[in-house]
């Protein structure tokens, strides 16, 4: 017999919810069942953002730095930045160079005496705001007064000068997209589907009457599925650690 020749298996929202309910010993019956499962999925995605680096959510971005401006807005769905450089001579095959820019804490940034001094940026403070949208009339001071969006920001130091052009090139972790409607597929790779289904089943068992007896096994299955998925979803390049040597003369 021949194999199917296909390798495009995936499940949409309704199918995963149905599978999760079955693991709880229940059936998907009402619109509310669907709605509460979708809510649990979005909470599950938020939990995954706290568990570490999800490789499929890494995206590259670029910000053109302007002379005299040291604070810039990141995309609103940014979780964090994992790498960043300052690029000079962008687009020039001969002169383009990516230079190190060091991440600093708010404490370190606060102690910089002159935050307006200009030069090539060598340090960046990443202000990880919530990304929430507030009514513009009651928006807090740290949100955009026009849009009401409390977007994440970067602040570089020194403030960019006009001696050359600078770009802030970064690699960010973005939020996993929401569950959406019943016909949507998920913003996760196929290898995460078993973990996604196991996690949703566990979350639903916390809410379904009569599913309490299944909680221990569902929690165990979710933990095991997450361990397998997280172990596979990682950077696999070789690493080399070299001790730092400091000399005092």
Model-inferred region functions:
Residues 1-249:
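Glycine-enriched, solvent-exposed interface loops adjoining structured elements
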């Amino acid at each position: 017999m021949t194999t199917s020749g296909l390798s495009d298996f995936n499940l949409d929202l309704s199918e995963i919810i149905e599978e999760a309910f079955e693991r709880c010993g229940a059936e998907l019956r009402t619109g509310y069942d669907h709605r509460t499962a979708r809510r649990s999925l979005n909470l599950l995605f938020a939990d995954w953002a706290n568990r570490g680096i999800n490789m499929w959510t890494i995206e590259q971005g670029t910000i053109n730095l302007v002379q005299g401006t040291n604070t810039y807005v990141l995309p609103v769905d940014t979780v964090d930045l994992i790498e960043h450089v300052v690029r000079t001579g962008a687009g020039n095959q001969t002169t383009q160079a990516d230079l190190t820019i060091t991440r600093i804490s708010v404490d370190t940034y606060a102690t910089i005496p002159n935050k307006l001094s200009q030069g090539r940026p060598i340090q960046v403070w990443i202000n990880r705001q919530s990304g929430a949208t507030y009514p513009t009339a009651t928006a807090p001071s740290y949100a955009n007064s026009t849009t009401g969006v409390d977007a994440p920001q970067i602040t570089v130091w020194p403030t960019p000068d006009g001696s050359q052009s600078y770009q802030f090139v970064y690699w960010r972790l973005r939020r996993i997209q929401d569950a959406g409607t019943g016909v949507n597929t998920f913003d996760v790779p196929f290898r995460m589907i078993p973990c996604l289904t196991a996690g949703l089943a566990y979350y639903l068992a916390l809410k379904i009457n009569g599913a309490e007896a299944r909680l221990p096994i569902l929690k165990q299955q979710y933990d095991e599925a997450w361990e397998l998925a997280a172990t596979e979803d990682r950077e696999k390049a070789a690493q080399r650690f070299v001790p730092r040597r400091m000399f005092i003369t």
